[in-house]
Amino acid sequence: MINVIGVRFRTAGKIYFFSPGQFAVKQGDHVIVETARGVEYGRVVSGPKEVSDDSVVQPLKSVIRIATDEDKRTVEENHQKEKEAFKICQEKIRKHDLDMKLIDAEYTFDNNKVLFYFTADGRIDFRELVKDLAAVFRTRIELRQIGVRDETKIRGGLGICGRPLCCSTYLTEFAAVSIKMAKEQNLSLNPTKISGVCGRLMCCLTNEEETYEVLNSQLPSVGDMVTTSDGLTGVVQSLSVLRCLLYTSDAA
C-alpha cells in the first residue's frame, strides 16, 4: 500500500495522484508539484489515503511544498498574463490568416510554457504562428487542438435545465453517449431537446442509463400481449419506466 493525495489543476479537471511526502497535507490545501508539463499549482481534492501500489502510475512524484502566499500571487499574475497572451495570439492568427478559433491561453505555474487551445475543422499548419509567438513570449509554446466538448468544458455555461454545465462543474472525463440512451429513456429524439451547448448529445443522458437498462429488462415492450394476475389480457400501448407502469388496450 502507498499513501497518496489527489490533486486537481483545473475545475472539473482530471485528478492526479502524488505522494504527500513529509508534508501534513489535507483536503482543500493548495500544493506545488512536479508534472509532465513542469512545476504546477494544484488543489488537493482527496486524501491522504492508502491505495494499492498497482493503482497508481509509478514512480509517484512527491509534493514539493504546500503553496505559500507568494505562490498564490504568482497564480493570479499568470491569470492576468494569460489574458494578454490570448489577445496577442488572436492578433497573430489574423496576421497569418489561419482558419482556427482560439479558445483559451494558459501559463504553466513556472512560466516555462504557454499553452494555447484552439478548435478547427481540419489540420492547421501553425509552424509560422509558433515562431511568432515564441519570439514574443520567449518561452516554450504549445498549440493544442481540442474538440467542441472540450471547448464547452473550458468556456462553461448553462444547460437547458438552467443549471451550470455538468462538464464544467464536476465531470472529469467524457463518457460515450448514444442515441440509444435517449430511446431507452423514452425521450424526444428532436436534436434540439437532447443536444447540449456543444451540439453533441447531452452528457446527462448517461446519468440514468443504468437504471433504465435494469427497469426496461423487467418490463414488456410496446406491442407485447400481457396478462395480469387477475386474468385481464391486453396489448401494451405505452410504458412509464421509472414508475414501473404500463398502459394497455383491450386485446379484443
Give residue spans per PLM region.
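Acidic-enriched and Gly/Ser
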Residues: 1-188
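Short aromatic-glycine-enriched beta-strand elements
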Residues: 3-5, 243-246
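Conserved glycine-centered short motifs in functionally critical loops
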Residues: 157-228, 234-237
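Conserved small/polar residues in nucleotide/adenosyl-binding loops
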Residues: 247-252
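A short, compositionally biased micro-patch
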Residues: 10, 136, 229, 239-240
